[in-house]
Amino acid sequence: MVQVAVMGAGSWGTTVAKVFADSGNPVTLWARRDEVADDVNDNHRNSAYLGDVDLPEGLSATTDPAAALHGAEIVVLGVPSQTLRSNLSSWREHIEPNATIISLAKGIEYETGMRMSQVIADVAGVGSDRVAVLTGPNLAKEVAQGQPAATLIACEDDERARFVQSAVAAPYFRPYTSQDVLGAEVAGTSKNVIALAAGIAAGCGFGANTNATVITRGLAETTRLALQLGADARTMAGLAGMGDLVATCTSPLSRNRSFGQRLGEGAGLEAAAEATKGQVAEGVVSCRSVQALARKAGVEMPITDAVVQVCYEDASPKEIINQLLGRTRKPE
């Protein structure tokens, strides 16, 4: 058994907390709101984010960060990428000296160009080998329901990766390990942008052929960027790359795809957020960061560029898709 703290009681944070608890570990979930913590403790549910999914007895909740982090050997950060730095700044003094810190956030800081694992190491003042990334084709609702799924635990320190792997392995949840943190994070961040493009195409009324084209060419541009930055090509073909991309680009449970679909139907950013319970999709936040990273690396990412144009430059979704098809022909 391993003491686990999960910081963030949204749908994915709560789901990951459930998986760790189902694996036999005592888990404390930090929630921002009293009513969420009370629901978890009194009713063994997080009705606000996971509906009627029953949570295990080994999972408790608190609104006190220090209490959640006390004694935790594994600290899971489940807050959005855009708030990770500020939240972690107030939590770092409570993190145990040798705890393994796991990032669930998929994003790149626009101001710094840093990946989330880099932000964590910087803010927490820890070595990069203490930071792991959990990523893969993991739609929260399906995992919370106990549907079979696999994930990737990426960490520079293979021993830590295997430690987390052992702690999070549940009957329905199979974790694999990797030391390619960079590749896992680039894939996870970029797939949110590609999923927006897939949703935009669906909102324009295009079908399976278009979706498959977006997925395939999206993987191609993601791979170009990742390899240029030094990632392992195998990561792009695995759970963090192709696996996560397919799930996010095809499922109606995907926030990014749903958000993109509203954009494709003609909604603006604010109106599109209604499709995702008022939350702006991570891909909207990340697309400019990915674009900036690609330009700095000298990598062409036309689908990412198209998403930026739709989200921030008032470009017509249909015109942008036609422009993509009209690009200079070349070998695959």
UniProtKB/Swiss-Prot annotation:
Catalytic activity, reaction form: sn-glycerol 3-phosphate + NAD(+) = dihydroxyacetone phosphate + NADH + H(+); sn-glycerol 3-phosphate + NADP(+) = dihydroxyacetone phosphate + NADPH + H(+)
List of residues binding NADPH: S11, W12, R32, R33, K106, A140, R255, V280, E282
Active site residues of this protein: K191 (proton acceptor)
Primary location class: cytoplasm
Oxidoreductase among keywords: yes
EC nos: 1.1.1.94
Top-level EC class: oxidoreductase
Disulfide bonds: none
Ligand binding (sn-glycerol 3-phosphate): K106, G136, K191, D244, S254, R255, N256
Family, similarity comment: Belongs to the NAD-dependent glycerol-3-phosphate dehydrogenase family.
Protein name per UniProt: Glycerol-3-phosphate dehydrogenase [NAD(P)+]
